[in-house]
């Protein structure tokens, strides 16, 4: 067996290693982030829909007070590391777990547009310039009463939390790649000791007697 064949195996191993690192570094973070965002958005939308059909609907029907609803949502917000808001269709803040709403000084999200999410229930970004310095995953669930949309429950979740999970999964990918490369080295060693060297000796012996 010619030496060039063995070098081809070594070269193939190096190419596999380089491309493996490039693929994990280039594609895995993006694909993982998109998957985690969709997964988290689905989870938050379920929570927002539940809030909309219970606390928020009761608030609009005057079956409970805003203070009572805020107390419940503050607890949920703290447990889930989220910001929960109730917003009117015009963008007026009805409730926000990060602050007290003053009825006399109405807070309004001026650029709020619920139609911007047509075809989706979540968005990633500053949420209509509400959080210009922090990217958020925001989900909206409509509050309906008497077959009309009275407002929206909005839940914001920091993208930095998703990126932390993304980096952890990326580290796992690197560990798996390292294991595969190690196994490849073991296969290369076995090939060298069991196949390449014996055949090389046979080839040399044949050449000597030729």
Segments and roles (model prediction):
Residues 50, 161, 205-209:
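The DHp (HisKA) dimerization/phosphotransfer helix of two-component histidine kinases
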Residues 194-210:
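Membrane-proximal alpha-helical signal-transduction linkers
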């Amino acid at each position: 067996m010619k030496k060039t064949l063995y070098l081809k195996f070594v070269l193939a191993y190096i190419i596999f290693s380089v491309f493996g690192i490039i693929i994990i570094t280039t594609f895995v973070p993006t694909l993982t982030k998109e998957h985690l965002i969709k997964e988290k958005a689905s989870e938050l939308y379920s929570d927002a829909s539940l809030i909309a059909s219970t606390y928020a609907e009761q608030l609009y029907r005057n079956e409970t007070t805003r203070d009572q609803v805020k107390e419940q949502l503050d607890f949920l917000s703290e447990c889930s590391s989220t910001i929960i808001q109730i917003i009117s269709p015009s963008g007026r803040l009805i409730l926000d777990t990060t602050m007290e709403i003053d009825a006399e000084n109405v807070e309004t999200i001026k650029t709020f547009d619920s139609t911007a999410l047509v075809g989706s229930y979540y968005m990633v970004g500053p949420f209509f310039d509400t959080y210009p310095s922090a990217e958020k995953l925001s989900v909206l669930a409509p509050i309906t009463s008497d077959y009309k949309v009275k407002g929206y429950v909005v839940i914001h979740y920091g993208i930095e939390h998703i990126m932390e999970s993304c980096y952890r999964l990326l580290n796992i990918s690197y560990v798996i790649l390292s294991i595969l490369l190690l196994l490849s080295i073991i296969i290369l060693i076995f090939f060298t000791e069991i196949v390449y060297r014996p055949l090389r000796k046979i080839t040399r012996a044949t050449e000597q007697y030729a």
